[in-house]
Structure formats: structure tokens, C-alpha cells
Amino acid sequence: MEKKKLSVQINFMKKNFSNFTFTSYNIISENDKHIGKRNAIKDAEYKDMIKSNYIGLSTVVINLKKIKKFKFSNLKTQEDFALWLLLLRRGYKLNYLNQFLTSWRKSKNSLSSNIFQKISDAFKLYYLHENKNFIISIYSVLILSFNKLIKNL
């Protein structure tokens, strides 16, 4: 991880009057080998985020003095995504800092690698948290899954 991650993001937040920032991130293997990267492309907007979670949790810095304290949902794998969507719905701006300041370790046995859990939680996210109807929730899971597949190619 970039040693100056926090100071870089906090300085960006001060200069841009931002209360929430996120960055792109590198993906490393269990053996610390660089195997890819996730490059977010812009500030988060609800219409884009609902289709693809491009904010890595470990890249986020939030000013809790300005953004009310929110709790993660009880979802096992989509709890961060649910929070980003909630903040966007409530009118908060999620600002992108175009730098790679974090590495995320991809692990074969992690909870986030369990595809069935992720699909189940994605459906719950759309149906219960976003209040979409059953058909729209299934459609949204398919779109989310397709976008995830494209990101992993």
C-alpha cells in the first residue's frame, strides 16, 4: 500500500471540499504478485453505481464530521456497495482521486470469492435495500454479474 495514502487523500479532500474519496487499486495474489488493477473512471453517480460497484472499500476515506455515521448492512459480501448506494441516494458526493494508493489481495478462499454468496447478497441488496421489485432485482443482479465478468477479463 502507498505509504502516504491517508495524507494524499486527506489533502485531496481539503482542496476539493470533499467528504468522501476513493481511488483506483492494484490487485495482488496471495504471494504478493501484481495480477491486475481496478481503475475507477470518475466520481460516483447512482445511475452508474447501481450497475457496477467500482469503489474498493480499502480505497475509501470518509470525513465522519460531515457525513453522518452510517452502519454497514447485514449483507455478508455487498455491505460496502449498499452503503455507497445509500450515500448517493441521500445526496452525498463520492469523489474519485485518480491515483493507485491501495493494493487488494485476491484470495481463493475468501468470503468475497464465494460466487453464490455474492449473487444472493446482490439480490438482497436490490430487492430489500434498494426496494426494487422482484423482476428488476433479478435483472439488476444479471447486469451486475455481467459487469463483474467484464472487469475480470
What does each model-found stretch correspond to?
Residues 2-3, 63:
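GHKL-family ATP-binding catalytic core of two-component histidine kinases
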Residues 4, 8-12, 82-86, 121-125, ...:
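Alpha-helical elements of Rossmann-like donor-binding domains used by nucleotide-donor carbohydrate transfer enzymes
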Residues 4-35:
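Conserved donor NDP-sugar-binding/catalytic core segment of glycosyltransferases
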Residues 13, 49, 88, 129-130:
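Hydrophobic residues in alpha-helical segments
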Residues 13-16, 38-41, 65-70, 123-129, ...:
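Alpha-helix C-terminal capping segments
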Residues 17, 91, 130-133:
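Glycine-centered loop/turn motif at secondary-structure junctions
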Residues 20-23, 28, 36-117:
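Conserved nucleotide-sugar donor-binding catalytic segment
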Residues 103-153:
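Hydrophobic helical membrane-anchoring modules
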